[in-house]
Amino acid sequence: MTKFTTEEVRSKFITYFKANNHTHVPASSLIPDNDPSLMFVNSGMVQFKNVFTGQEKRSYNKAVTSQKSLRAGGKHNDLEHVGYTARHHTFFEMLGNFSFGDYFKEQAIYYTWDLLTKEFELPKDKLYVTIYHTDDTAASYWEKISGLRDDRIIKIKTNDNFWSMGDTGPCGPCSEIFYDHGEEIYGGLPGTKDEDCDRFIEIWNMVFMQYEQINKETRIELPKKSIDTGMGLERMTAVLQHVNNNYDIDLFQEIINFTENIVKVKVDGEAKFSYRVIADHLRASSFLIADGIIPSNEGRGYVLRRIMRRAMRHAHMLGAKEPLMYKLLPKLVDLMGNIYPELKIAEGFISSILEQEEIRFKTTLERGLKLLTEETKTLTKGNKLSGEVAFKLYDTYGFPLDLTEDILKNRDIAVDHKGFEELMLIQKERARTSWLGSGESKTDQLWFDIKEQYGSTEFLGYTLNEAKCKIIALIKNNNLADTIQEVDTQFLLIANQTPFYGESGGQMGDIGMIFSQDSEVEVIDTLKYLRSIIVHKCILKKGKINIGENANFNIDIKYRKNLRIHHSATHILHAVLHKILGKQVIQKGSLVTSTYLRFDINHSKAITNEEITLIEDKVNEIIRNNHEVNTTVMFTEDAIKQGAIALFGEKYDSEVRVVKIGETSLELCCGTHVKRTGDIGAFKIISESSIAAGVRRIEAVCGEFVIKLIREKDNLIKLIESSVKTNKNELITKVTNILERNKELEKELEKAHLAGLDLSIEQIKKQAEQIAGIKLLYKKVGNINNKILRQAAENLTQKLENLIVVYIAHGVGKLSITVAVSKAITDKFNAGIIAKELSLFLGGSGGGGKASIAQSGGNDIVNLTNINKKLLSLIVT
């Protein structure tokens, strides 16, 4: 049997099916875009789910893939086993061939047997197959094609050999192929009590999708039958490399050996498991980040953080003192970057995230481990760690619960899950992660009390700009009030309903006026507390306002219009960024104001001028096309199923508002929007910058503010034209000439300054003061740059062996100090010390340099009159 590399196994599988008229379909993202029930893509068929159900048509009816997959959340959670067993992984590759109404059982079985026995040269006497116990058709095809005896075609009665997509939908019997590693390894045949041991290993699974489940009692034949298969690349490679452990294949061994060369710990004993965990989790972490997931405390981001921190804890166990994971990334990219180019594209970003997360976790890891050691000193085998300690490790030290369990596993100590979950529930109820309303102070408790008494504020502003509302609470200086009657007093106001939008989802709150029978109130901002109470920040302009009275609430219509314009533009921008920069782009934050918008994204490098132009052009094209903007309310699950973008870190209720902009954008959003994209008018990016490692910020203006920007720039150009006496066509040439001439003049000025400071030996002796056996030359000069002063001072100290030169340059609001000492006397006088003391004397922060030359600064110009006395004291002492 030929020995194949991992790359050769993958390549041969794909090549075989391409030769048999299958279309090679690239792997989809690990983030499913067609199945909200899945946290991650966990098999090859996920990207074809809608094809199997008939909801989607493609240009091909046969496909082959190598699909990146991940099992580390939900019911497919293999995390705790990874590294300790032979075949558990978080990240793995699933090879698969698929037929959508084309070939069926006979051809599928033929392809499988032909590829395994001829292309991969597996011995026939090493192979067993299983079928569903009623699938006589599959049994007859296996006998016909493979020639296997009846005892090697095993009928299974359980649902292990019958697959379904859910309670309803396509389903069908399965057939699995097993490889026998030999009698020297313990294990039983499929269907026996020892089937889960390591002798007989499943290497390929075929699903014969021939039925549709209508309901619990009814199942009918599908008119077009399909094939879905899956072969674990790592398992198959282990078989073809004659090893019984996936971590012994070439791909993992390369990563493990690379890691060993860095940490210098031998791969054996307990360390062996740590190396395996790191190798597996490096792959999972890197591919998740490449697909746009960032470590966080919720959802997919939290699964990523758990994986990363588990690997980092094992790196710590190997004695790694510095961040390790990012140093291993180049090896992974080298091994897998060709088949998965997203790794190469995102390498810099992945490296940055890996390093940042490890640095962040290392600061608390050792303290958390110390706490865990202290708390488990008295615990013995079979005991439980208290939920309180587990929660403290989670909340204070960033230990995911499964990391704590992983650490305690070898000591057979469990964790009190119930106690942990109770404390988690208390934390959520207190909303500690909210920017307001943690329940931990009197003020915060006030908001909980208001919410408990009055419930959520009804928002009317999607359809109304003004409304009559009842005032239910007035708050002044963090205390409830019955009446506000001091004019110009600032206070908070809550009503039963309001057309004012409370700041949320990145959109600023509304401003406007409230009129009651006896008062006029200016609303200077509108906020949202505890995600549901709309709070008006007000100033009393006239009269008095009372709790319980009705008032007319009027938003500033123009202000709201500009908010709508900029908010809708952020949705369009988001969609365009996906098209131009890639679908891995994730919104990290946004701010929608009435005058501009701000949009933060994960992106590892600066957005080029060419890309900015493309983005602007595409956004403006969508604006000009005047697409309709529709909003609907639906269940969150249904919205996501339809492809609506849900932002990571955002919390959503069971029902959400979905904003659809033509065929361009579909997002969950509670904000206010234009009716048609043409209402936006125009879009212009005004800045692009980095605000953190791997995060870029785009700022832009829309509508009338684009016109204003153009007018300002046009006026600026006209002013420059007038100043330099030229026209627009000659402006660049004229300015370039001026700048070049300015450089020449600066050089001439520097030469003049240097010449003016140069003195002959006789002039030095004449101008310098004789003190304590040395000569001191002190001069106050104008605003001359430090480079010239340094050069001039050094030139003079080279002419005399016992000279100290001190220049103090007086610039605009600051002083520059230069001190030079002849090298012959640096054993007695240190320029660095003198410069530092002078700086402190003149209000600076000190400075320094070498013994022979130093520079510093100050800003106490008044004290400059006493500098002579200070200089003398420094030299005489």
From Swiss-Prot:
UniProt-annotated location(s): Cytoplasm
NCBIfam families: alaS (TIGR00344)
Protein name (database record): Alanine--tRNA ligase
Family classification: Belongs to the class-II aminoacyl-tRNA synthetase family.
CC terms in the record's Gene Ontology section: cytosol
HAMAP family (alphabetical): Ala_tRNA_synth_B (MF_00036_B)
Known EC number: 6.1.1.7
Known catalytic reactions: tRNA(Ala) + L-alanine + ATP = L-alanyl-tRNA(Ala) + AMP + diphosphate
Cofactor note: Binds 1 zinc ion per subunit.
Keyword match Transferase: no
Residues that hold Zn(2+) according to the record: 567, 571, 669, 673
Entry text on domains: Consists of three domains; the N-terminal catalytic domain, the editing domain and the C-terminal C-Ala domain. The editing domain removes incorrectly charged amino acids, while the C-Ala domain, along with tRNA(Ala), serves as a bridge to cooperatively bring together the editing and aminoacylation centers thus stimulating deacylation of misacylated tRNAs.
Source species of the chain: Rickettsia typhi (strain ATCC VR-144 / Wilmington)
